[in-house]
Amino acid sequence: MKKFFPFRGKRKTDDSHSHSSEVPISLAKTAPPSLSIGGGYHLRDKHLKKLHKAATIGNEQKLKDYLERKKYNVNGRDKRSRTPLHLACANGYTNIVSLLIENQCKINVQDSENRTPLIKAVECQQESCATVLLLHGADPNLVDVYSNTALHYAVCGQNISLANKLLQYKANLEAKNKDGHTPLLLAVAENNENMVKFLLKKGADVNASDKNHRTAIMIALIVEPTSSVKLLLQQDTDLAHKDIYGFTAEEYASFNGFTMYHHITANNENKKKTEQTAY
């Protein structure tokens, strides 16, 4: 996931739309630690309790034996507040997930980073585990320490199937993480056109803005002139909206080159003409 930094320098005071070193856009190419996909837990066998270890390696028989003895807590936590359910979900053991649920484990429990088993299943691309959790009442709107929901992780993982399933279970389409990114803004930042299309069809707010008041069209123009720009322009995009530095989408376009600037302004003029004709 790319990280966006504010414009540096002073804003130009004239009406020129040429490139200016006074308003460059800085874009880091590395992913921030707040949101990543595919990462399971880093575990050390010697630190694992018996129930946790059985869940981690998917040993159903041992898990049954431990649970039948009733001397092991199905909701027991390790040093990082992870339960056996967290570990089973991270490793994709649907049978273990079902067994733990049958034995009354807590489903919406959070680890040391506030990640629920559902968030962990989505983060690790374990759709079958996520499905079982949702069927048994997992809350898709709980957030981790960075305020990411399971839907944010599904978007980051480019998993439309999982995103759709989460929305079927009332996931909040407009939830914002600590960067102010809704799932749509995140999809645009990741330059994932298929996910952008999907979220727009589901009714995502095209004019939602991040903590710097940047809308989807602005973020698309920062990433690079992409097909997502054209897609967003087909929506009811507010081109007059200003970010915290006072820049509009048209100015973002001008920073990225003359051609893209005219693509935006031409679309804006067409919208104005359409509105005038309507009256």
UniProtKB/Swiss-Prot annotation:
GO terms for cellular component: nucleus. GO terms for biological process: blastocyst hatching. It holds the Pfam family Ank. The keyword Repeat applies. Transmembrane segments: none annotated. ANK repeats lie at residues 80-109, 113-142, 146-175, 179-208, 212-241. Disulfide bonds: none annotated. Keywords: ANK repeat, Repeat. The keyword Repeat applies. Residues 1-25 are annotated as: Disordered. Residues 1-11 have a biased composition (Basic residues). PANTHER family: ANKYRIN REPEAT DOMAIN 36-RELATED, ANKYRIN REPEAT DOMAIN-CONTAINING PROTEIN 7. This is Ankyrin repeat domain-containing protein 7. The gene is Ankrd7.
